[in-house]
Amino acid sequence: WLAGDEPAAIAIVARRGSAARLAAFALRPAWRGKGLGRKLMQELLMLLQQQGIETVFLEVIRDNHAAVALYQSLGFTRRYGLCGYVSTELLPPVPGVLQLYPTLSLLRRAIEESNSQLPWLLDPLTFATLPCQVVTLEQRAFAVLTTAGSRPVLSFLWVEPAARRQGLARELLMALAQQFPGLGTSVTVPETFTPLFAAAGYTPLSLQQYEMTMDLADA
């Protein structure tokens, strides 16, 4: 959005079929506190609805109470509390425990099962176009490591349905910490997984978010 020739606000939207994610929304400082954020968000949501978008997702920092209140007033509801974790225990590496696995082979299996029930940034579709590698423990538990930065980031865990509730996810997290000291996640993991990460020696990050969603069909 422009005020004359000067940018006043910006929104970045990612699309995935009939769903969209508000990847970024920002106002220049001079335009804040004037009700413009609400007005522009209403315009954006109307535009997305006209383009056939049915559901909109976004993430917001939990402590940003003003932003949370704004999104709630527009009709967004909290879907997940999101946390991040980092491995803090120094464990000696054990070679050969983890093996590489074809990325697309895992994603095809995980996409079929997830059925859009995960947070947007954890949906397996996210990783189909990102630089990443997959490692596996016993060909039953799998981890996606994104490799766009200087060090890998743990971005996704998946255990075969028949192998769940056997401790494999915890074993995989511990093996990852051994092979990649200091490995962490982004703030994209549902907070219900905190006990799992704690049991594997990972510490929660201080930053926390909400994923919020809005059904435009009800708007």
What residue spans do the PLM features occupy?
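Amide-forming acyltransferase catalytic core, primarily the GNAT-like/NAT-type
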Residues: 74-146
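Conserved catalytic-core motifs of GNAT/GCN5-like acyltransferases
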Residues: 59-61, 72, 77-90, 203-216
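Conserved GNAT acetyl-CoA-binding A-motif
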Residues: 48-59, 178-192
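Conserved acetyl-CoA pyrophosphate-binding loop and the N-cap/start of the following alpha-helix
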Residues: 31, 35-43, 163-175
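Flexible loop/N-cap segments at domain edges
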Residues: 134, 154-166
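Conserved beta-strand in the GNAT
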Residues: 6-14, 21-26, 138-158
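Active-site acidic-Proline motif in GNAT/NAT acetyltransferases
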Residues: 15, 28-30, 34, 62-63, ...
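Hydrophobic alpha-helical segments and helix pairs
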Residues: 37-78
